[in-house]
């Protein structure tokens, strides 16, 4: 059923069209009322498909059903991976009906494209088109379908603070994407704050998706009203002016400290619903994503006035998807990838739009600054280290961690490369400072929170990437060294690449974490500096909000490890009093987190991420790191013998004793020397049996020459 294609006779269905939400809710409720067992829902789904229900609609409804069915959870029946989708099966080299959904990826070795080839968003296509990243996003939207799940006529709230979760996942995706761009010296993403902005770069979906989704040329923008090529369907489009009104109303609400509310079904006057430190982030996120049903009603029965604030996030998806709409006479009408959770991340326009959505989180986080000592654990942290697990391997370095770009799985619609990194670990020393020392009878519980940020982004709250969160119990005052492997992370997805399930991790939450192989940015060849930050908190100081009890969702509710009692992304979820209230103007995040004397429950360290190339699945080639001290005068000019200079001047017209000539032809020189075609050997000597007095370049000489090139061919000073 997940592999069935959409035909022309099917009534259109688009995941990101808000007006289509009733369709999905209707089909989902039909499945849930079919019976208590999964087989009942499956049989009902088959009946609906025979009645020509759109297969794309059924994929989403059935996915939500399987995730939230108590019978499916008990029997560990999981949603098929994204590779079971018709778009992936159509790209297999054998007929789709004969393909097993457990077949491994067809990894094709080939060129790994880098900044030398692509510029702008195209350079990060390998990251956006990653199979596991898109599977994570697709599954996340079925796990949290945007509102509540209806069971027996009752709306069941799946999790506490859904609006806060929404803003956190958006902010973390943007932070990781921008950091990946910095690894290639790309600028930060420009947010789509102005709705008449333009997309400077175009986009064309990968070959397997161009049959289903449209692209757009450079310098595209939203239509002011609607794309004239789209059929006139009711409740499909929202004008740019209406979107701007919703946006400005939300801005005004955050600024004023309240949203307008009213009693449903009445014409009563609007009444302010105040924002507080406890509800601000969740309320703002729920309004931006139009998750009105998830908001608890106020004691006097008021709810947020949806007419004022609309459905900004989802209609924004639709406006971008309209840009790509193409009505081919021989194909089904095509929206862009932004119309679907299936592949929206692949489209570069996803990122400026969600950088804009992140700005609502930025505004909310600045509204109520927090004291970062309020939930401190009474401990002293020190000796924070993040490093490779095994330093004896061929790719491990003493001065950092190696990430790599390897061959993509083309049949799973990956593009250009597959990102990965060597296994790493982190550790920190913990010593209790509690007035009553911890013991076996009276342990001290605390939570360690690990984040990283690019060195240039340390002072931006929303650029910190959450890496791990773990509870530790101290039973003595002695120093404890806590060591965590990368696969232990509570943030990392508990499954292997290409949807390989871990039998030990079958909770629905386990697929809602960040892909394991993408936990680290790709880094730079010469090493990119990062800061790691660890904080110890006492979470018992903040009462945990729990989802209302429901047997139907018992397995989900008992395993809400994604929730954080101190706030999603704490302590970077809100501005710090220690920062914004500093009258001297000298405080900054960098300065605060480095002050171990004032804040002993925090510690930092620096490390580097080095980029390598993985040409095949089983081999990684370490790049040569350019030594910055090599210049023309102190090293390179001595590589060329007088006979070489005479030969090249006579045969090719350029002088190997001339700096400008060598710099101009450095690429050709490196190619000839590394392939041992130069220096040219004269009889009776040969390239295979070179003259000892006129030797070929050693590998070290070739590496040094290449390093000199990568550093811009520095000339240096003539000591003579």
Swiss-Prot record:
Cofactor binding mode and count: Binds 2 copper ions per subunit.
Enzyme Commission (EC) number: 4.1.99.-
UniProt keyword annotation of Metal-binding present: yes
Coiled-coil blocks: none
Catalytic activity: (-)-cyclopenine = viridicatin + methyl isocyanate + H(+); (-)-4'-methoxycyclopenine = 4'-methoxyviridicatin + methyl isocyanate + H(+)
Residues that coordinate or bind Cu cation A: 137, 141
Keywords for the protein's UniProt record, in alphabetical order: Copper, Lyase, Metal-binding
Gene Ontology molecular function: any one: metal ion binding
Origin: domain of life: Eukaryota
Annotated binding of Cu cation B, by residue: 313
Keyword DNA repair: no
SUPFAM superfamilies xrefs: Di-copper centre-containing domain, E set domains
Pathway: Secondary metabolite biosynthesis; Alkaloid biosynthesis; Mycotoxin biosynthesis
Functional note: Cyclopenase; part of the gene cluster that mediates the biosynthesis of penigequinolones, potent insecticidal alkaloids that contain a highly modified 10-carbon prenyl group. The first stage is catalyzed by the nonribosomal peptide synthetase penN that condenses anthranilic acid and O-methyl-L-tyrosine to produce 4'-methoxycyclopeptin. 4'-methoxycyclopeptin is then converted to 4'-methoxydehydrocyclopeptin by the ketoglutarate-dependent dioxygenase penM through dehydrogenation to form a double bond between C-alpha and C-beta of the O-methyltyrosine side chain.
Protein family: Belongs to the tyrosinase family.
This protein's name: Cyclopenase penL
Species the sequence originates in: Penicillium thymicola
The organism's taxonomic lineage, starting at the top: Eukaryota, Fungi, Dikarya, Ascomycota, Pezizomycotina
Gene: penL
């Amino acid at each position: 059923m997940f592999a069935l294609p959409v035909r022309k006779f099917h009534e259109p269905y688009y995941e990101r069209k808000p007006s289509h939400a009733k369709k999905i809710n209707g089909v989902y409720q039909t499945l849930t009322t079919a019976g208590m067992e999964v087989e009942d829902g499956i049989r009902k789904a088959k009946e609906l498909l025979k009645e020509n229900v759109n297969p794309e609609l059924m994929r989403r409804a059935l996915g939500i059903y399987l995730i939230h069915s108590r019978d499916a959870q008990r029997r560990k029946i999981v949603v098929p991976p994204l590779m079971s989708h018709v778009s992936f099966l159509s790209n297999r080299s054998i007929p789709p009906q004969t393909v097993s959904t457990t077949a491994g990826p067809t990894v094709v070795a080939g060129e790994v494209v880098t900044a030398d080839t692509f510029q702008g968003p195209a350079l990060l296509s390998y990251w956006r088109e990653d199979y596991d990243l898109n599977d994570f996003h697709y599954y996340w939207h079925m796990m949290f379908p945007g509102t509540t799940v209806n069971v027996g006529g009752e709306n069941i709230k799946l999790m506490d603070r859904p609006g806060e979760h929404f803003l956190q996942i958006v902010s973390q995706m943007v932070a990781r994407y921008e950091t990946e761009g910095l690894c290639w010296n790309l600028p930060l993403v420009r947010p789509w704050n102005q709705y008449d902005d333009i997309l400077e770069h175009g986009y064309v979906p990968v070959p397997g998706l161009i049959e289903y989704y449209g692209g757009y040329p450079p310098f595209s923008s939203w239509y002011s009203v609607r794309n004239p090529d789209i059929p006139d369907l009711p409740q499909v489009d929202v004008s740019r002016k209406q979107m701007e009104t919703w946006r400005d109303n939300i801005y005004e609400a955050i600024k004023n400290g309240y949203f307008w509310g009213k009693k449903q079904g009445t014409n009563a006057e609007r009444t302010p619903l105040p924002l507080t430190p406890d509800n601000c982030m969740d309320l703002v996120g729920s309004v931006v994503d139009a998750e009105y049903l998830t908001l608890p009603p106020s004691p006097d029965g008021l709810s947020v006035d949806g007419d004022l604030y609309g459905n900004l996030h989802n209609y924004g998806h639709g406006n971008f998807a309209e840009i790509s709409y193409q009505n081919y006479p021989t194909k089904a009408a095509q929206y862009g990838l932004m119309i679907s959770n299936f592949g929206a991340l692949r489209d570069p326009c996803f990122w400026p739009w969600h950088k804009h959505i992140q700005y609502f989180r930025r505004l909310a986080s600045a509204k109520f600054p927090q004291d970062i000592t309020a939930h401190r654990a009474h401990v002293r942290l020190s000796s924070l280290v993040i490093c490779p697990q095994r330093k004896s391997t061929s790719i491990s370095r003493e001065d950092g961690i190696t990430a790599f770009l390897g061959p993509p799985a083309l049949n799973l619609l990956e593009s250009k490369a597959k990102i990965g990194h060597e296994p790493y670990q982190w550790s920190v020393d913990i010593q209790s400072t509690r007035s009553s020392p911890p013991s076996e009878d009276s342990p001290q519980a605390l939570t360690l929170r690990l984040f990283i940020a690019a060195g240039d982004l340390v002072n931006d709250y929303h650029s910190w990437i959450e890496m791990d969160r773990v509870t530790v119990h101290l039973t003595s005052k002695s120093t404890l060294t806590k060591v965590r492997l990368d696969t232990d992370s509570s943030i990392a997805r508990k499954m292997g690449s290409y949807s390989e399930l871990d039998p030990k991790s079958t909770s629905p939450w386990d697929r809602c974490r960040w892909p394991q192989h993408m936990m680290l940015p790709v880094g730079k060849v010469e090493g990119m500096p990062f800061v790691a930050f660890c904080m110890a908190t006492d979470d018992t100081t903040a009462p945990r909000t729990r989802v209302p009890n429901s047997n139907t969702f018992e397995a989900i509710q008992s395993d809400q490890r994604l929730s954080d009692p101190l706030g999603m992304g704490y302590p970077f979820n809100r501005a710090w009093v220690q920062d914004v209230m500093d009258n001297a103007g000298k405080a900054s995040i960098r300065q605060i987190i480095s002050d171990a004397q004032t804040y002993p429950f925090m510690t930092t360290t620096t490390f580097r991420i080095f980029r390598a190339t993985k040409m095949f699945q089983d081999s990684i080639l370490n790049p040569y790191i350019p030594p910055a001290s090599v210049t023309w005068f102190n090293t390179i000019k001595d590589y060329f013998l007088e006979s070489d200079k005479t030969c090249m001047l006579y045969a090719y017209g350029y002088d190997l004793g001339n700096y400008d000539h060598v710099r101009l032809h450095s690429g050709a020189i490196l190619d000839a020397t590394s392939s041992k075609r130069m220096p040219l050997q004269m009889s009776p000597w040969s390239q295979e049996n070179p003259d000892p007095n006129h030797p070929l370049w050693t590998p070290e000489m070739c590496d040094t020459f290449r390093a000199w090139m990568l550093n811009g061919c520095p000339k240096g000073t003539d000591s003579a």
